[in-house]
């Protein structure tokens, strides 16, 4: 068997992987809700900053410049506050932005747009970073998220199939103030 590259899977393994998502209402404390709101705002801010930088570069050169990483933004003195945010959430912003630019140039979609505070969904996604010492885990009705010390209480209203690995979590704040946590498991 030859070398395998990142993102490349055996056909048998690809068929064997099943993903299942569950969405539960959550009840974060006031402090947790404040942190989650900051993570949502930082994700929107980074998207808008990446888009502005990309558009400026595209106007100047007429070509798509390489997209900066969240770490490069964290190094700027006026953006040092990004260091306190969930790095995996910011990495997901970069991945989504790269996909949007790719779809724009392939003609599948229009040009990426800026995200306004009250006109886009209040959400961010974070991933599992380490299987041995998971930063993201569900224990009964308590969900441990990165950068949040205490677990968030969920209303687990349906049974979660055993044996799955929690891969990511999308945190959403609805306009009525309720919080939802979408958990993606891989079996």
Model-derived features: where do they sit?
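Nucleic-acid substrate recognition interfaces
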Residues: 1-187
């Amino acid at each position: 068997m030859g070398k395998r590259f990142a993102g490349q899977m055996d056909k048998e393994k690809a068929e064997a992987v099943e993903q299942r998502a569950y969405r539960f209402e959550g009840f974060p404390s006031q402090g947790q809700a404040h942190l989650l709101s900051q993570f949502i705002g930082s994700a929107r801010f980074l998207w808008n900053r990446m888009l502005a930088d990309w558009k400026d570069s595209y106007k100047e050169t007429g070509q798509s410049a390489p997209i900066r990483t969240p770490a490069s933004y964290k190094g700027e003195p006026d953006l040092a506050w990004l260091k306190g945010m969930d790095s995996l959430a910011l990495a997901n912003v970069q991945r989504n932005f790269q996909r949007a630019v790719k779809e724009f140039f392939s003609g599948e979609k229009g040009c990426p747009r800026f995200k306004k505070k009250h006109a886009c969904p209040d959400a961010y996604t974070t991933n599992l970073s380490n299987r041995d010492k998971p930063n993201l885990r569900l224990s009964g009705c308590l969900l441990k998220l990165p950068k949040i010390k205490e677990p968030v209480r969920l209303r687990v209203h349906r049974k979660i199939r055993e044996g799955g690995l929690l891969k990511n979590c999308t945190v959403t704040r609805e306009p009525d103030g309720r919080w939802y946590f979408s958990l993606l498991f891989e079996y």
